[in-house]
């Protein structure tokens, strides 16, 4: 990639998660901070690309069942109306590693990343006109979301997404590096 990750000072929460992640990474290197941030960045970009391409098959491979069902309904609604939602990432996303639950149980083990990104986001109708979303002045938007990632067959996928305000609890949730550690 031509552009590397955005460098910034990590938050206190991110430093605490990274310390716990170093312990978790001894058991599974995919939990290491650099590995999680790289995987989250790749996944975020791939999800945006697949959404822009209206590629439900690719989306299905990258997200959990509930999220896929919700997105599939939205894509079908766009198609029914003759609309296409276009999204394009502007620059690199900022990824903060803010949550960790690693007990060795694949059903509950997860990481949480906070994503801050700028996107060009608009809808094109059947006639090729660009439709603005209500309440927006232009096509450029900034998203701040908490993505919960889980693993399946050794690959991270998006289990859930919370918008900035609804995801704030993620910054308070317990950090668990292993089945024997329980740091609050």
Protein language model regions, located:
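Residues in flexible loops and secondary-structure boundaries
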Residues: 70, 98, 103, 121, ...
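Short beta-strand edge/turn micro-motifs at domain boundaries
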Residues: 2-17, 110-112, 123-124, 130-184
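Short, charged low-complexity intrinsically disordered segments located at boundaries
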Residues: 72-79, 99-107, 176-180
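Surface-exposed, charged secondary-structure patches
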Residues: 83-127, 135
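Conserved NTP-handling cores and scaffolds of large molecular machines
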Residues: 44, 51, 75, 79-82, ...
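Core segments of small alpha/beta cavity-forming domains
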Residues: 6-96, 184
């Amino acid at each position: 990639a031509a552009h590397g990750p955005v460098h910034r000072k990590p938050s206190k929460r991110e430093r605490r998660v990274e310390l716990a992640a170093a312990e978790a990474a001894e058991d599974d290197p995919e939990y290491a901070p650099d590995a999680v941030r790289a995987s989250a960045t790749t996944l975020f970009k791939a999800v945006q690309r697949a959404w822009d391409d209206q590629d439900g098959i690719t989306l299905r491979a990258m997200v959990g069942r509930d999220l896929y069902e919700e997105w599939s309904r939205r894509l079908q609604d766009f198609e029914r109306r003759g609309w296409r939602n276009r999204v394009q990432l502007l620059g690199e996303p900022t990824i903060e590693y803010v949550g960790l639950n690693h007990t060795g149980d694949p059903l509950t083990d997860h990481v949480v990343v906070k994503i801050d990104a700028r996107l060009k986001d608009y809808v094109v109708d059947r006639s090729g006109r660009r439709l603005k979303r209500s309440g927006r002045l232009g096509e450029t938007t900034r998203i701040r979301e908490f993505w919960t990632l889980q693993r399946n067959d050794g690959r991270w996928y998006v289990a859930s997404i919370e918008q900035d305000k609804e995801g704030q609890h993620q910054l308070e949730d317990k950090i668990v590096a292993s089945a024997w550690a329980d740091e609050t």
